[in-house]
Structures are given as C-alpha cells and as structure tokens.
Amino acid sequence: MRMPVLFVGHGSPMNAIEDNEWSRGFRSLSGLIPRPRAILMVSGHWYTNGTFITGNERPETIHDFYGFPRELFAVQYPAPGDVDLARQIRKLIGEDRSELSSEWGFDHGTWTVLRWMYPHADIPVIQLSINAKLTMAEHLDLAKSLAPLRDDGVLIMGSGNVTHNLRDLMRQMQTPDFSPPDWALNFDEAVKKAVTTRDRKSLIDLWPNGPGARQAHPTPDHFLPILYTAAAADPADQVRFPIEGFDRSFSMRSILYG
C-alpha cells in the first residue's frame, strides 16, 4: 500500500503536554492514514550545513528549547531508529551528498507531534536534516528522490509551520490580541493555493518573494518542510487540510497528500 505524505504545523512545544485543539488534532491524524512501518521526518529544527540522516538505533529525545515548565523537559519519546532504512535513504539521496549522523535524535518538531499520533513510540523514526546550503530547486530535487519510500511503507512527514515568526509571536503574547495579522493570513492563503493547485514553482517562489514572506518566515527553516512534502507527493494525490487555524501569528495548517 502506498503511504500518504504529511506536513504538520507543530507550533509551541507546549502542545506536547497540553490538551488543546492542536494536540487533539495531532492525535486524530493517525486515524486518517494507514499505519506506517517507519517514519521519515523532515523537521525545521534540524537546519544544518550539509545533509544528514539519523543513523542511531536508539535516538535520544532532544529538548531544544528553554524557559518552559519542567514537565515538558521530562517528556521522552523512545521510538527506535532504523539503521538499514537510514542507509537506504542515503542511497536515494546520493551517498556523495549525504551522511549518517549519530549526533542528533528527535527534536521537538518531531516528538511533540508523534507522541500524540503514535503514543506507544513503537514505529521506527528517521530524521533528515535540512541543508541550509541548498537552493530551493535543489531542495525540491532532493525531496523528489525520497518518493519511492512511500511504496515501502514509509510515512514521509514534514514538521514546521506555514507561518513562523517567533519575534512577532513574543510581541503578540504581550497583548490581549490573539488574532492573526494580515501578513500571516495572506501567506497562509498563498501556501494553501499553491499546494491545492500542485504548483510547485509558485510554492518555491513564495519564499522570499510571496505576500508577507519575510514576516511569515524571517528564515526558511520552518517553510522548507512544506516544500519537501509537496515534492514527495504525486500529482494524483488528493490534498486535504486536516488541521487549520492560527495560534496567534502561527498558522497551524497541516497538509495531507494521498
């Protein structure tokens, strides 16, 4: 069975421990897709100079944030890795263009979502880093090379946010106004249109040239997982948005292909 492709807007790390509309949305996602034999995650929180693939048998849970409650730092997501799958992914990308790494594990872009989707942590998970040195077109080509994994029971996932401006979020948290600003609404709508029409060129052009792009993403790390999942999808795949809405200026939109 061919697996779908999924992008998730992960939002605040607190979604990992709070019962809210976003965590309930994450929990519901697993019911929309067949159970995968493994998961390949592209998280906006592993942004590197080079292309790396986790090659650990037992990846650690990384708490890559600060200033949050102790309860959040206590969360563990003990899913196994899969070294053989990591090697297979490296071959698909190109062994001359990628490396296995044992220096990373599961960052919060991964485990804050997966602990709701698959709480037993019994599905192997591999993380793929986002290479900061690549052009948008090169990211697209790399992501396309991952598509055969779908026919091998692997769920390809991206985790970021359609809009992600931490400075603006912090500013907004000091005010009583929870409504998303116009630039966030406009960029979210542009992404929705590009993925619905399967217009990859328009999607690539959205950063940094789209409406409100520099406000939506001062840096591209949380935007690129959207591109990876769009590229791994097939033009014949149905496109759905199982989670929509805003947490202040963060778009929490999720995108399911297939």
Which positions does each model-derived feature cover?
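A short aromatic-anchored loop/beta-hairpin motif
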Residues: M1-R97
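Short glycine-enriched loops at secondary-structure junctions
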Residues: G44-T48, R58-P59, F106-L114, V162-T163
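Internal, conserved structured core segments that host functional sites
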Residues: A86-L140, S145
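Surface-exposed, charge/polar-rich loops and edge strands
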Residues: K91, P124, A132-L134, L140, ...
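Short, basic/glycine-rich phosphate-binding loops at helix/coil junctions
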Residues: L6-F7, D64-P69, Y118-I126, D205
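Beta-strand elements within well-structured catalytic alpha/beta cores of enzymes
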Residues: P4-V8, A38-S43, L128, L149-V162, ...
